[in-house]
Amino acid sequence: MTKKSASSNNKVVATNRKARHNYTILDTYEAGIVLMGTEVKSLREGQASLADAFATVDDGEIWLRNVHIAEYHHGTWTNHAPRRNRKLLLHRKQIDNLIGKIRDGNLTLVPLSIYFTDGKVKVELALARGKQAHDKRQDLARRDAQREVIRELGRRAKGKI
């Protein structure tokens, strides 16, 4: 199973910053993506957005939807549609496992990032559960409390108390 996130030697093109705020991440997967040539060139220029992106299962295949990859500015009539659906490449066992988990629970597939690994475009895909408003408030309160603890420890280390 290829469970790894974008490491430091990979060039990250786009990240979904709201995903960790709106969802509880349960598991992550690395998936390949089927792209056209102008899409790869546009990604190399960093022209992508994962805002409002999600993945769905259709006929035993996983499709990435609502990802915006801008048209390649040097492209001609061969340019791609910016928000077309793109097929994700995973092993059959991984796809079957994801389908089972999605059907069993209230889970969804959310792309966390798009990056290059050895010249190939990869998507970090997360199996996630949506957060309610009270969950978001609890996370915010927990982060504030942690920040206060760190601030207090810094003051004590400097001898200001």
Swiss-Prot record:
One example GO MF annotation: RNA binding
A Pfam family recorded for this sequence: SmpB
Subcellular localization(s) per the UniProt record: Cytoplasm
Gene Ontology biological process terms in this record: trans-translation
Keyword Cell membrane: no
Record key words, sorted: Cytoplasm, RNA-binding
GO CC terms of this entry: cytosol
PANTHER family membership: SSRA-BINDING PROTEIN, TMRNA-BINDING COMPONENT OF TRANS-TRANSLATION TAGGING COMPLEX
Described function: Required for rescue of stalled ribosomes mediated by trans-translation. Binds to transfer-messenger RNA (tmRNA), required for stable association of tmRNA with ribosomes. tmRNA and SmpB together mimic tRNA shape, replacing the anticodon stem-loop with SmpB. tmRNA is encoded by the ssrA gene; the 2 termini fold to resemble tRNA(Ala) and it encodes a 'tag peptide', a short internal open reading frame. During trans-translation Ala-aminoacylated tmRNA acts like a tRNA, entering the A-site of stalled ribosomes, displacing the stalled mRNA.
Similarity annotation: Belongs to the SmpB family.
Name listed for the protein in its UniProt record: SsrA-binding protein
